[in-house]
Swiss-Prot record:
It comes from the Eukaryota. InterPro entries: SPR1. Residues 44-69, 84-116 have a biased composition (Pro residues). Expressed in skin. Also expressed in heart and skeletal muscle. Residues 1-22 form the signal peptide. Keywords: Secreted, Signal. The keyword Transport does not apply. This is Psoriasis susceptibility 1 candidate gene 2 protein. The gene is PSORS1C2. It is found in: Secreted. Residues 118-136 have a biased composition (Basic and acidic residues). GO terms for cellular component: extracellular region.
Length: 136
């Protein structure tokens, strides 16, 4: 049933876009003879001639505006002369002290416990490949 409603909707849409009216005396499109008299372009009657433009076809692109000589390098300052730096937009910061811990309790000299003593004597490396016994 849903398919029938969809088909009916498509049919109504097609009839509406074509402009079909109920009266037979007023066709929606004039006959071809009336169109020729109205001055509409006619279709070509033979094969196209090389070099001739297509009849009635509008140009694809409009002509671009005339180009004016643009030389942005002339706007640059002379060599060795540069524009001044623009002013900074960030708010000014108060001067920073040299001491990273300016106030309050100071950190201990070395907060870490002392490291264990390390034996720097060379140790013998263990033999990772012990000799194998032959199995019989």
């Amino acid at each position: 049933m849903i398919l029938n409603w969809k088909l009916l909707g498509i049919l109504v849409l097609c009839l509406h876009t074509r402009g079909i009216s109920g009266s037979e005396g007023h066709p929606s499109h004039p006959p071809a003879e009336d169109r020729e008299e109205a001055g509409s372009p006619t279709l070509p009657q033979g094969p196209p001639v090389p070099g001739d433009p297509w009849p009635g076809a509008p140009p694809l692109f409009e002509d671009p505006p005339p180009t004016r000589p643009s030389r942005p390098w002339r706007d640059l300052p002379e060599t060795g002369v540069w524009l001044p730096e623009p002013p900074r937009t960030d708010p000014p910061q108060p001067p920073r002290p040299d001491d990273p811990w300016p106030a309050g309790p100071q950190p201990p000299e070395n907060p870490w416990p002392p490291a264990p003593e390390v034996d720097n004597r060379p140790q013998e490396e263990p033999d990772l490949d012990p000799p194998r016994e032959e199995y019989r």
